[in-house]
Amino acid sequence: IRFLGSQAGEFPYVRGTRSHNRWRVHQTVEVKCPREANAEALKLLNSGVDSLGFSIAKEGFTAEELDQLLAGISIPAIEMVFCGAQTGSIAELVIAKLEKEGTASEAHVAFSIDPLVKGLSQKGDFCSPNGEKCFAKIASLIEKTREYKHIRIVTVSAGIFSNAGSTIVEELAFALSAGNDYIARLTDAGVDAELAARKLRFSFSVTSNYFLEIAKFRAARMLWA
């Protein structure tokens, strides 16, 4: 096999963005009762998990409930991903909490805000006409977290395409197209293109087609770089 000419952690990141091989162990917690979800999260952390996902279905989630959910969790020590019904509002609560506690610059946090794939592709519409309100809010969140390099605001949920029957190549193509559309829409909303790219992440599916899935991830890194 011909040498790619780059090491792991080097452009175009075919072998990954990290030079080490320390993978995180991720588990998602369904949040119905914040206290119960917190107990489950602490149990998972004590069992070796170091990346937590919180799926919050409840609308009107409050700052007090967020404090209950994250009680006893050392936020800088782990990675967190928030998804659910009103992720934009939850993002505002989380960012405010991190800034209040002085941990925003250390925190590794991502939000599954995805009006293009979860909204337009899956449901046929945005949260507002033409999506202007959606992208204005995303632009605002990006500006708030401009200096926090480990906080990602937008997640391209590529797994939705796979679950709808797309091939590996189609999933990759649709995901990159959505990523490009995000950059275009966010720059139209006044966000610098480089900053918009830093605040975006991709979430792909993994099927049993082992070698092609590995090739998909490698291709995704190279093409997006």
Language-model segment annotations:
Residues 213-225:
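Extended amphipathic alpha-helical segments enriched in small hydrophobics
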Residues 1-209, 213:
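Catalytic alpha/beta active-site cores
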